[in-house]
Design a protein with these regions (language model features):
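Hydrophobic faces of transmembrane alpha-helices in multi-pass small-molecule transporters and flippases
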Residues: 20-40, 98, 102, 133-137, ...
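Helix-loop junctions and terminal segments of transmembrane helices
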Residues: 71-87, 272, 276-300, 365-368
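Membrane-interface junctions at transmembrane-helix termini in multi-pass inner-membrane proteins
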Residues: 142-164, 296, 351-381
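Signature of the first transmembrane helix
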Residues: 3-6, 18-76, 237-263, 379, ...
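Interfacial segments at transmembrane-helix termini and the short loops linking adjacent helices
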Residues: 117-136, 263-264, 325-357
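Interhelical loop/hinge segments that connect adjacent transmembrane helices in multipass membrane
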Residues: 4-16, 188-195, 206-248, 296-299, ...
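Hydrophobic alpha-helical transmembrane segments
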Residues: 130-134, 163-217, 381-388, 396-424
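Membrane-interface alpha-helices at helix entry/exit sites of multi-pass transporters
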Residues: 56, 88-100, 301-310
């Protein structure tokens, strides 16, 4: 406990490039741990329970994750930008941001639930149940809050906090699953949701405690609520546009695969795509850490960019090599057909870590220097080009064509980002 307290109570000292790298490692490790533990959760659920129960629960969890992407509204990114500009008011800004996060998540979840029983049944089955709807609302709030807390930890230079919260989430979710299995072998779909709710509560409680002991006492008098809210929303919405432009292809490509090649092909594509995104989280997390460092110092430091790039390439490159080597084994866990159809796809997608590193460093610098709309344009063009190229090549060559189309767009974006980043650093 003493060691854990030391992790979260180090005084808030804004950081040079080496601390940016340390924070990036914590963020990347936390996000990767979250996805890895989530994979194990679903693997265990598939072993313990019927496909109907697992499928219905997965539909609701996927719907929740979609809601969290919209419900963030860039609030966490706004904190990364605004905290360095409002010294002495960090505690106040974080409090206001978290309250807005709760309100926004509830609003998005209610809108989603209000879409109608037909759509929701397609997403998860038994969502018409009031209990399932209530659990869904809680999951959306906790899931969105946890994402904003991750970004807040980056703003404070405390990447280790992210790892602690995500490991706690995974452990509690696993214990909840085992508890449900001990009680009954034939639970209702809504029962598994409570394992996620319990995990979300644990992660958020830990996060609140971390911020309580980490954030310095407020100084400089009482902060105007309207001013804080205006700064958070003004900065946040611009960052949200970039985030949505960047993440939209992850949601669109599986849908396109179904339309072009059919559901069977998508069954092989989706696990390969998710494995690739575990890798992509590494440069994305490091880019977020660079964003925090640039926003703090209000200038682009070559040493910070070089350190972040080196960290991303070392960790992401090592992980990519590991995935390339173990691709067949990883997919074989799901079944022989998955390994046969998806091994080459995973290997090609894994190579995307290298050009994506340049793109994410560029995005991080753009976020930190108020060049949001420039980066948003690049992300939108890259995403549209990636989906278009993947669709054209996929229709002719199947899943490997989808992978080649996506990789080509990522590589082109990486080249542009490298050139543009070089120009920005020379100014």
């Amino acid at each position: 406990m003493t060691q854990l307290r030391e992790v979260v109570t180090v005084p808030t000292v804004r950081r040079p490039s080496d601390v940016v790298s340390q924070s990036a490692i914590g963020m990347a490790a936390g996000r990767a741990a979250s996805m890895a533990l989530g994979f194990l959760f679903w693997l265990a659920a598939a072993r313990f329970f019927t496909p109907v129960v697992v499928g219905a629960t997965a539909g609701l969890v996927s719907s929740m994750m979609l809601c969290t992407q919209f419900a963030q509204f860039g609030i966490g990114n706004a904190l990364i930008t605004e905290l360095p500009r409002n010294r002495g008011q960090e505690r106040y800004f974080v409090t206001v941001a978290l309250w807005w996060t709760v309100i926004a998540a509830l609003a998005v979840a209610v809108v989603f639930l209000g879409l109608g029983a037909t759509v929701l049944r397609q997403a998860g089955g038994s969502v018409a149940s009031p209990v399932a709807g209530f659990a869904f609302l809680i999951m959306c709030v906790l899931g969105t809050a946890n994402i904003v807390m991750d970004q807040t930890s980056m703003a404070l230079g405390r990447g280790a906090q992210v790892l602690i919260r995500n490991l706690s989430f995974g452990a509690v979710a696993a214990l909840g699953l085992l508890g449900i299995r001990a009680i009954t072998a034939a639970p209702r779909p809504v029962s598994l949701l409570w394992a996620w709710v319990a995990a979300g509560v644990a992660a958020c409680v830990i996060g609140l405690w971390q911020f309580h002991v980490t954030l310095p006492p407020a100084s400089g008098g009482h902060m105007n609520h309207r001013h804080a809210s205006a700064r958070i929303w003004g900065t946040g919405l611009a960052n949200q546009a970039l985030t949505l432009a960047e993440r939209a292809p992850t949601l669109v490509l599986p849908i396109v695969v179904v339309q072009v090649l059919g559901a069977r092909a998508n069954a092989a594509w989706y696990p390969a795509w998710m494995i690739a995104w575990v890798l992509y989280i590494i440069p994305m997390s490091v880019g977020m850490a660079l964003f925090s460092g640039v926003a703090d110092e209000r200038r682009i430091r070559r040493s910070a960019v070089a350190s972040a790039t080196r960290t991303s390439l070392l960790i992401g490159g090592a992980a990519a090599i590991g995935v390339i080597a173990a691709a067949h084994l990883l997919l074989s866990v799901l079944g022989k057909g998955y390994a046969t159809d998806g091994t080459d796809v995973v290997r090609l997608l894994a190579l995307g870590v290298f050009p994506l590193t340049a793109t994410q460093m560029y995005f991080g610098v753009c976020r930190g220097t108020d060049r949001i709309w420039e980066a948003t344009g690049v992300a939108a063009i890259s995403g549209i080009a990636g989906v278009a190229a993947a669709t054209i090549l996929g229709a002719d060559r199947g899943l490997i064509g989808f992978a080649w189309g996506w990789f080509a767009a990522v590589a082109a974006s990486g080249i542009w980002s490298t050139v543009r980043l070089t120009v920005l650093m020379e100014r």
